Amino acid sequence: MNAYRNILYAINLNDENITSIIYALEFAKLFSSRIHIVYVNDPQAGYRHPTDREDAIALRVRETVPESLLENLDVVYAASKGNIAEEIVRYAQDYQIDLIMVGHKHRSRLYTALFDSDDVSIIDTALLPVLVIPEK
């Protein structure tokens, strides 16, 4: 099995569901990995999230997950702007990421046919393993 020294978790700050971030943090702890929690603000989406700075992302994570998950865990917070899939893949290359983790919401076929999905775009763009975590 691969040693996952650097894991990237692509966070969606608009999502209230915390299943995938908890899973990502537990996974990083299990492998004693550094986890990079990365938010990408896509200007094409026409919305700028108010917490698109590293310190604000860190605060949001600390307010969302149990404190025990962050203890003794090497966490890097990062923010970027651009196409979500391209920025996640660029970050992964720049920081020698071994595994990308993304949350996934199940959508209807109609929704899937009409709208792009960030997680699917990341999977299609990345040239390294991507672990998809279903959101409840």
Where do the language-model regions lie?
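Structural beta-alpha unit
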Residues: 2, 69-100, 106, 120
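Short, hinge-like loop/turn segments at secondary-structure boundaries
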Residues: 52-56, 118-120
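Conserved hydrophobic residues forming the short capping helix/wall of the S-adenosyl-L-methionine
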Residues: 28, 61-69, 92
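Short glycine/serine/threonine/alanine-rich loop segments
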Residues: 33-34, 73, 97, 128
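Gly/Ser-rich helix-loop-strand patches that form or flank binding pockets
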Residues: 93-136
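Small/aliphatic-rich secondary-structure junction motif
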Residues: 2-51
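Short, solvent-exposed loop/turn segments at secondary-structure boundaries
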Residues: 48-52, 112-115
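General small-molecule cofactor/ligand-binding pocket signal
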Residues: 38, 76-80, 131
